[in-house]
Amino acid sequence: DVAPSRGLGDVYKRQYQHWSYDTLHRLCMEAFQKFGFTEAEADIIQDVLLTADLYGIESHGMQRMVRYHKCIEKGMIDVHAKPEVVFETPISAVIDAHEAMGQLVSHKAMEMAIEKAKTTGVGIVSVRNSNHYGIAGYYAKMACKEGLMGFSCTNSEAIMVPTFARKAMLGSNPIACAFPAEPYDFFFDASTTVVTRGKLEMYNKMEKPLPEGWALDKDGHPSTNAPDVLANIVAKKGGGIMPLGGSTEQLGSHKGYGYGMLCEIFSSILSMGATSNYCMTGGKGQICHGFMAINPAYFGDPAAIKEHFSKYLQELRDAPKADGQERIYTHGEKEVAAVKRIMENGIPVNDNTMVEVLDLCNYLGMDFGSYFGDYRPPVKKDVFKGNY
């Protein structure tokens, strides 16, 4: 079974409401059109966010909606931006997003990569001057649904403290890969930091201390104080989140750091865009993304390759289990289970997120009650202290 949110466990159990997919879909569609997006654009954005919620990744789901609105009001996201292809070959392209909504330019970029892969065997597209694009895995799955191998990565505001450093210089820099298989597609999506900034935000909302080994304060010392770590990240005062592997080479810190650099190469370096340490500065997002689609047909019979991979995945699931363990998962199984469970039981939304949604509805002139009936969030608190 899948926990309510991956990596958060019991933190949520007493402080969230469950809402139907249809309710949140309608809410997001109205809100994003109120933000100034077209109906088609709003549909892409909400699909990325609610897909994250259905996977159990609440940190990247509809709770991001209010922050996006703040970024639009600050001029960081340009609702009317027209992404521009500034370099292109039969197998590659570079897009300047001109500060567009990350989900919109990313959807376009992966569509380009898919079409190139169908024609030439591979498509690689790098994007600069964008904004937060949601979960990396959404775009990898776009290619997978077309029978291709999909790859997606993005840099972000600097939150990763390199091994032996005390200042954040890389983003969470997630990497995602999806490959067709039966009965479950292979689907891997993970940050190259111990956790994402979104996880810190959720602990902040819950007023819970961070687990040991996640974060560092401005002086480079271990910290469990979520508000302090987040404030330091926003103010660029130092500290941040540890690389995947933790704080020492003995635990593999240099590996998470290295994976983060691979992401940086595919996103900011190939696009000649801003590296993570320059993202979210000067009032602009400047975030960069990388997308790749690979056509298995250029390696042989796609059906045979899919069957070969599916056989190996089943062998992994059938491997001898450790004492006390009932099941071995392959990547992508838990997301399938999460979608089924959450569609049946409703999408969990934190009460403090609902406070933000209520405020947003009031600000935009939307009828909160038409979505949530008589429910009103029990807490009225600016957990971000103005920092969304």
What label would you give each PLM region?
Residues P209-Y278:
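Secondary-shell segments that build the walls of catalytic and ion/ligand-binding clefts
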Residues P90-E182, A190-S191:
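A generic, well-ordered mixed alpha/beta core segment in the N-terminal half of proteins
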Residues D1-Y12:
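Single conserved hydrophobic/aromatic residue that forms the stacking wall/gate
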Residues K13-Y21, R26-I45, L50-T51, E58-V79, ...:
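Acidic, glycine/proline-rich low-complexity segments that act as flexible tails and inter-domain linkers
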Residues H60-I114:
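Active-site cofactor/substrate anionic-group-binding motifs, chiefly glycine-
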Residues R14-W19, L24-L27, I265, L270-M272, ...:
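Catalytic-core signal marking the mid-to-C-terminal active-site face
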Residues M160-V234:
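Phosphate/diphosphate-binding glycine-rich loops and adjacent basic-rich segments that engage nucleotide
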